[in-house]
UniProtKB/Swiss-Prot annotation:
Pfam entry (one): ANF_receptor
Annotated Ca(2+) binding sites: 81, 84, 87-88, 100, 145, 170, 188, 190, 231, 234, 297, 489, 557
Molecular-function annotations in GO: amino acid binding; calcium ion binding; G protein-coupled receptor activity; integrin binding; protein homodimerization activity; protein kinase binding; transmembrane transporter binding
Name this protein carries in UniProt: Extracellular calcium-sensing receptor
Stored SUPFAM superfamilies: Periplasmic binding protein-like I (SSF53822)
PANTHER family given in the database record: CALCIUM-SENSING RECEPTOR-RELATED (PTHR24061), EXTRACELLULAR CALCIUM-SENSING RECEPTOR (PTHR24061:SF358)
Record field: compositional bias (Basic and acidic residues): 919-931
Region called Intracellular loop 2 (ICL2), residue ranges: 699-722
Listed transmembrane segments: 611-636, 649-668, 675-698, 723-745, 770-789, 806-828, 833-854
PTM note: Phosphorylation at Thr-888 by PKC impairs coupling with G(q)/G(11) G-proteins, while it does not affect G(i)/G(o)-coupling. Phosphorylation at Ser-899 by PKA promote plasma membrane localization. Ubiquitinated by RNF19A; which induces proteasomal degradation.
Species annotation: Mus musculus
């Protein structure tokens, strides 16, 4: 088995030596050998391998000048180290460098050479081989370029723990140490580059891009990382395509069609130059311009793409370049290259031919004749000349390298070349650490050190992982746990050189991976030249920017970057472009007309200064003034009959409550505060209840006095002044209790209402409890209803007491106002709620004031003749006569029915005649006037002791039984004469009938003396007279003052019933008669 392994190793080495001839490698002996993998060519020639004969090795095509420069950088670094006394003294580094042709197959051929040589060296087969010279093991490999190539190489080298230090492979997949154990690199991870690309797109506010990636281990992971970063930044990708340098024409055209039809103007490309070149050629052929290319580092400075004939397509490209380094002496080293001097560099011959477009004869020592063409195979060589060199002129060998412009001499921005230089020095410093290792301080078991003369690849890998040194630029070089060397990026922009028309790469910014997020990117926009030589940033968005005041609205079925601009709703705003959502204004603010900002809402309430508030205030003040004026009039004329008849004390209290009603309306005007909200409803409710309570007590007392059948001492006791005030207090106290409960359980408070109107804040009072408010108004209306009932019943009282009629009107007004108030209150909002209540308060208050008091004030001020005791007595007597007359007219029908039942004759139909004459012309004789003036009012005791006096009649009519009642005033006499055509035998029936009739008359007598109970009338068969002394006529609500004494010379009106069952009025003048007739 051992011999079988030896044979495999020998076969691999033999095969590899035949595959790579002398012209296909750069090699130099040394104590320690470093391997190198560089893309000297961009690809290989496609051949149809039909396997009819032995397959031949593919031929590399399309020379890569930058690849040759990178190779030169490795050779320069090795020679510089060999000449340095400080680094690896007494040791020489050698190299074996192969061309990968930018393909995996060629790279693996070279890698097999490294692995096979190491295997042979480890087997120590020199004693079995007839070898002319010993080739040491390759302890480290520098390369490769593309991530796909490096991935394949790393898988193979990792099996033998041969360290691989790449200078250009940036795929993030290579950071996986579980798979790529021996891989390290001097270029940053693509993860940072993808993040930087997304940051650039976000910086220019682009959100609609396309992506193109090479279909390899470099393009796919890179573009996948970009997608992740783009999604975090709300960047949408319109299309995503994969390309390769081996893609056929149809595939390339399909990708170009997608690019041409897309609305995305920015295209992100993760690819190498060779993979992208076929696509760019087709785009140039179709002349598709106006695109912004965002280039990854692999092609950002590619000479295949950065060609002047492509500039109208790729001009303005933004790319990422590695940080340029300084390599002292490298420029001179590049200029010294010559095929006859570079004996260890087998690639120099082809470089010379490609640079000067000539053919260099093999083995030539001097210049060859110009214009000599070679059409056959050269001696000593088996290589078939390709079409690019077959008909070239021979090279003289004296060509000047500085006379031509090639990427090889672009040494101003050394990026990849510096990475190669740094990779070589990293390996050298690892070897230096081994060389200077002291026993006990080593990295191996028990602190042991490796032997530099017998060093193995895995030992170098161990030291590379712990490497830490300072390079020639003063930077610290160390590999992280993933084998990556963190670095920064330069941002370059493709310009057209005005000097020679070539494409130059202008540095317009940088990306610092060490900085904080948001501070990593710096771009100088003034230096950027966009496609078409424009200085304006191109637009690459699916939708136009949404200006301030709008937001982005999602379009169904489209990516999130494709949106429509939706205006912010009222109450919301957006102060920036492309806002994803509108911000809601604070509660006290509202959006302006353009929805770009918030402005303070208008605050509205029933203000003192607005016209409506001024009008209501003036009406309230007018009401207060009128009420105060009426109160003043009543106080000034407090001793007049009209004022006395209205119960002065309750009238004063009623006017005071009206003052409070008018004043309470002012609490509803002005900005509501907590204290005004808690005061206004109770003030309104208590004031109105006090007012209505006064009216209720007055009205009810008048009704009870005038309709009481027997006004006994019980009535006089309980309807005194104190009881009246007590009833007013009790009615008002109930309202006070309601208000206290309301304020304790749910007190009203000021409230800023934002919901009624969007742009206005209504400052109103929150009532706390609608039930409490309803109870307050309901109790007020209940008292008003009771008051209305009694007032309606009292509407026909004497004229001087007919304020009940006006109270009825005022209550009607009150109900109309408050019934209208309820729907108006419920249907209004804002300040109009307060206005409606103020109007209701004022209307009800004016109604009460006008109906109850204006008529009296008018009489007091403008009709003083009606403000006399005679007027009051006449009105009272008229009411009494009307009641008595009604009772008298009803009685004959009753008597007739009773006579019929007893078998008596039917009485004649009563007739009546009414006449009005002076006292001297009375048809019926008047009783003699009393010689002594009687007191107008008697004490309670005197009223109880004084009997009714019977006086003889002045005229006798014996043929008719006659019962006569005579009522004597201090100023005259009123005589009631009642007669019936009844037989003598029915005297007892007559007596009973007269007693019943006297009860009807007592209703009238009650109006004459309400403080004195009337005894039943005493009637005999003969006429009789009853005289009652006048106690003075007073208003129905007054009980604490003495009436004035009138002169006895004036005769008061009298009602006299004749023998023919008619009645006449005696005395009082025609006006009284007319009033009675009217009644």
């Amino acid at each position: 088995m051992a011999w079988f392994g030896y044979c495999l190793a020998l076969l691999a080495l033999t095969w590899h030596s035949s595959a790579y001839g002398p012209d296909q490698r750069a090699q130099k002996k040394g104590d320690i050998i470093l391997g190198g993998l560089f893309p000297i060519h961009f690809g290989v020639a496609a051949k149809d391998q039909d396997l009819k004969s032995r397959p031949e090795s593919v031929e590399c095509i399309r020379y890569n000048f930058r690849g040759f420069r990178w190779l030169q950088a490795m050779i320069f670094a090795i020679e510089e180290i060999n000449s340095s006394p400080a680094l690896l003294p007494n040791m020489t580094l050698g190299y074996r460098i192969f061309d990968t042709c930018n393909t995996v197959s060629k790279a693996l051929e070279a890698t097999l050479s490294f692995v096979a040589q190491n295997k042979i060296d480890s087997l120590n087969l020199d004693e079995f081989c007839n070898c002319s010279e010993h080739i040491p093991s390759t302890i480290a490999v520098v390369g490769a370029t593309g991530s796909g190539v490096s991935t394949a190489v790393a898988n193979l080298l990792g099996l033998f723990y041969i360290p691989q230090v790449s200078y250009a492979s940036s795929s993030r997949l290579l950071s996986n140490k579980n798979q790529f154990k021996s891989f390290l690199r001097t270029i940053p991870n693509d993860e940072h580059q993808a993040t930087a690309m997304a940051d650039i797109i976000e910086y220019f506010r682009w959100n609609w891009v396309g992506t193109i990636a090479a279909d390899d281990d470099y393009g796919r992971p890179g573009i996948e990382k970009f997608r992740e970063e783009a999604e975090e930044r709300d960047i949408c990708i319109d299309f995503s395509e994969l390309i390769s340098q081996y893609s056929d024409e149809e595939e390339i055209q399909q990708v170009v069609e997608v690019i041409q039809n897309s609305t995305a103007k920015v295209i992100v490309v993760f690819s190498s130059g060779p993979d992208l070149e076929p696509l760019i050629k087709e785009i140039v052929r179709r002349n598709i311009t106006g695109r912004i290319w965002l280039a990854s580092e692999a092609w950002a400075s590619s000479s295949l793409i950065a060609m002047p004939e492509y500039f109208h397509v790729v001009g303005g490209t933004i790319g990422f370049g590695l940080k340029a380094g300084q390599i002292p002496g490298f420029r001179e080293f590049l200029q010294k290259v010559h095929p006859r001097k570079s004996v260890h560099n087998g690639f120099a011959k082809e470089f010379w031919e490609e640079t000067f477009n000539c053919h260099l004869q093999d083995g030539a020592k001097g210049p060859l004749p110009v214009d000599t063409f070679v059409r056959s195979h050269e001696e000593g060589g088996n290589r078939l000349l390709n079409s690019s060199t077959a008909f070239r002129p021979l090279c003289t060998g004296d060509e000047n390298i500085n006379s031509v412009e090639t990427p090889y001499m672009d040494y101003e921005h050394l990026r990849i070349s510096y990475n190669v230089y740094l990779a070589v020095y990293s390996i050298a410093h690892a070897l230096q650490d081994i060389y200077t290792c002291l026993p006990g301080r080593g990295l191996f078991t028990n602190g042991s050190c490796a032997d530099i003369k017998k060093v193995e690849a895995w030992q170098v890998l161990k030291h590379l992982r712990h490497l830490n040194f300072t390079n020639n630029m003063g930077e610290q070089v160390t590999f992280d746990e993933c084998g990556d060397l963190v670095g920064n990026y330069s941002i370059i922009n493709w310009h057209l050189s005005p000097e020679d028309g070539s494409i130059v790469f202008k540095e317009v910014g940088y990306y610092n991976v060490y900085a904080k997020k948001g501070e990593r990117l710096f771009i100088n926009e003034g230096k950027i030249l966009w496609s078409g030589f424009s200085r304006e940033v191109p637009f690459s968005n699916c939708s136009r920017d949404c200006q301030a005041g709008t937001r982005k609205g999602i379009i169904e079925g489209e990516p999130t970057c494709c949106f429509e601009c939706v205006e912010c709703p009222d109450g919301e705003y957006s102060g920036e472009t492309d806002a994803s959502a509108c911000d809601k204004c604070p509660d006290d603010f509202w959006s302006n007309e353009n929805h770009t900002s918030c402005i303070a809402k208008e605050i509205e309430f029933l203000a003192w200064t607005e016209p409506f508030g001024i009008a209501l205030t003036l009406f309230a003040v007018l009401g207060i003034f009128l009420t105060a004026f009426v109160l003043g009039v009543f106080i000034k004329f407090r001793n007049t009959p009209i004022v006395k008849a209205t119960n002065r004390e309750l009238s004063y209290l009623l006017l005071f409550s009206l003052l409070c009603c008018f004043s309470s309306s002012l609490f509803f005007i002005g900005e509501p505060q907590d204290w005004t909200c808690r005061l206004r409803q109770p003030a309104f409710g208590i004031s109105f209840v006090l007012c209505i309570s006064c009216i209720l007590v007055k009205t009810n007392r008048v009704l009870l006095v005038f309709e009481a059948k027997i006004p006994t001492s019980f009535h006089r006791k309980w309807w005194g002044l104190n009881l009246q005030f007590l009833l007013v207090f009790l009615c008002t106290f109930m309202q006070i209790v309601i208000c206290i409960i309301w304020l304790y359980t749910a007190p009203p408070s000021s409230y800023r209402n934002h919901e009624l109107e969007d742009e206005i804040i209504f400052i109103t009072c929150h009532e706390g409890s609608l039930m409490a408010l309803g109870s307050l108004i309901g109790y007020t209306c209940l008292l008003a209803a009771i008051c209305f009932f009694f007032a309606f019943k009292s509407r026909k009282l004497p004229e001087n007491f007919n304020e009940a009629k006006f109270i009825t009107f005022s209550m009607l007004i009150f109900f109309i106002v408050w019934i209208s108030f309820i729907p108006a209150y419920a249907s209004t909002y804002g300040k109009f709620v307060s206005a409606v209540e103020v109007i209701a308060i004022l209307a009800a208050s004016f109604g009460l004031l006008a109906c109850i008091f204006f008529n009296k004030v008018y009489i007091i001020l403008f009709k003083p003749s009606r403000n006399t005791i005679e007027e009051v007595r006449s009105s009272t007597a008229a009411h009494a006569f009307k009641v008595a007359a009604r009772a008298t007219l009803r009685r004959p029908n009753i008597s007739r029915k009773r006579s019929s039942s007893l078998g008596g004759s039917t009485g004649s139909i009563p007739s009546s005649s009414i006449s009005s004459k002076s006292n001297s012309e009375d048809r019926f004789p008047q009783p003699e006037r009393q010689k002594q003036q009687q007191p107008l009012a008697l004490t309670q005791q005197e009223q109880q002791q004084q009997p009714l006096t019977l006086q003889p009649q002045q005229q006798q009519q014996p043929q008719q039984p006659r019962c006569k009642q005579k009522v004597i005033f201090g100023s005259g006499t009123v005589t009631f004469s009642l007669s019936f055509d009844e037989p003598q035998k029915n005297a007892m029936a007559h007596r009973n009938s007269m007693r019943q009739n006297s009860l009807e008359a007592q209703k009238s007598n009650d109006t004459l003396n309400r403080h004195q109970a009337l005894l039943p009338l005493q009637c005999a068969e003969a006429d009789s007279e009853m005289t009652i002394q006048e106690t003075g006529l007073q208003g129905p609500m007054v009980g604490d003052h003495q009436p004035e004494i009138e002169s006895p010379d004036e005769m008061s009106p009298a009602l006299v019933m004749s023998t023919s069952r008619s009645f006449v009025i005696s005395g009082g003048g025609s006006s009284v008669t007319e009033n009675i007739l009217h009644s």
